[in-house]
């Protein structure tokens, strides 16, 4: 069995175990409301919990210019109706529209970008503090594996 299939089976099993405590679902944001839920979670984790000092356009929202170009993978708790985990994904075609990758604002990616093939940048990863038992990150990995 190929590695990707084994990983998918593993993460599906992890998701079933996670469901015994919480009703969790992995999905992509499909509305502005979903994006805001991801941005609120990022604010809670990065700014409130970790003390990051980032420019805020809105109170309680962690966002930047790349958000509207990206896909946002969410783990949603169906019982509490909130995002409890998220990834921000920027494909190569989205990066062209965004004027580059977020990582290019921090690092020189000249050599990386010269490598043939397609690239995907994954960032702004976070998990709600009450859900850090492995289930949410497993669901995020499963969703990312399916996306790839």
Describe each PLM feature range.
Residues 1-8, 41-61, 120-141:
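Amphipathic repeat-derived elements
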Residues 1-21:
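Short acidic N-proximal helix/loop "leader" segments that mark the beginning
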Residues 5-11, 53-57, 70-72, 100-109, ...:
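Short amphipathic alpha-helical surface micro-motifs
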Residues 7, 32-35, 52, 72, ...:
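A generic structural micro-environment signature
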Residues 14-84, 88-91:
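Short amphipathic alpha-helix that is part of the acyltransferase structural core
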Residues 92-148:
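Acyl-donor binding region in acyl/amide transferases
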């Amino acid at each position: 069995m190929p590695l990707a299939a084994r990983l998918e089976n593993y993460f599906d099993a992890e998701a079933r175990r996670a469901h015994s405590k919480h009703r969790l679902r992995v999905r992509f944001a499909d509305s502005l409301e979903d994006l805001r839920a991801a941005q609120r979670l990022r604010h809670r984790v990065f700014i409130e919990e970790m003390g990051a000092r980032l420019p805020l356009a809105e109170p309680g929202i962690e966002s930047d210019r790349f958000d509207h170009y990206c896909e946002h993978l969410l783990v949603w708790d169906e019982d509490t109706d909130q995002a409890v985990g998220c990834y921000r994904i920027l494909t190569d075609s989205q990066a062209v529209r965004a004027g580059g990758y977020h990582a290019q604002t921090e690092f020189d990616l000249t050599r990386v970008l010269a490598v043939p093939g397609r690239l995907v940048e994954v960032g702004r990863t976070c998990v709600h503090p009450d859900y850090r038992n492995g289930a949410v990150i497993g669901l995020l990995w499963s969703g990312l594996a399916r996306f790839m």
